Amino acid sequence: MAQSSAVTPKALAKWLAELPEFAKSKLWGIGGSCLLQQLGLVLQSRDLDLVCTPAEFTQLCCALSAHLPQLAVSKHPTFCSDYFARFQHHSGIEIELMAGIKVQRHAIVTAWKFEPAQLWHDEQLPWMSPQQWIELYQLFGRPNSVALLTAYCQSRGITVD
């Protein structure tokens, strides 16, 4: 990706979607603050959160590492996903790729399964559903983001469990 002062997480997502490995795979999606921005819930996204199936993780991780430096990731006491990698674009924007998401709280590990069938496409990008990120933000302990997405869904008649 060419250097530019206007690099955004969404612009990085568009660039990634054109890489052969990402273009061939239908088993990854965009979430996190980039999804919140796409839905008009925040003005700016901080980073780019990508979720994929465990089977796709290695291929997509290799594609990212061919273009971007991979950052060291320390073991986290709460977040214990099967697969997790963090990369950094020269603009400073971080890209997190995760699969087999698991969270440990009070000695209980909760696994979350990514469902590619729930993806929706806009601007030729695969977006995760708001409902998926309500579940993830609940697991991650982010009540403000849960509230934003829940209100968004309720205002549009989208069922939230």
Please place each PLM-identified region on the residue numbering.
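Short solvent-exposed loop/turn micro-motifs enriched in small/polar/acidic residues
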Residues: 43, 78-81, 109-112
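Catalytic cores of NTP-dependent nucleotidyl/adenyl transfer enzymes across multiple folds
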Residues: 105-161
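Active-site nucleotide-donor binding segment shared across nucleotidyl transfer reactions
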Residues: 16-55, 59-61
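Short, solvent-exposed loop/turn segments at secondary-structure junctions
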Residues: 35-36, 57, 102-104, 132-134
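Short secondary-structure junctions
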Residues: 26, 65-78, 117-118
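Helical scaffold of the NTase/Pol beta-like nucleotidyltransferase catalytic core
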Residues: 1-29, 147-150, 154-161
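Conserved catalytic core of two-metal-ion nucleotidyltransferases
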Residues: 69-105
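A structural micro-motif
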Residues: 26, 93, 123-125
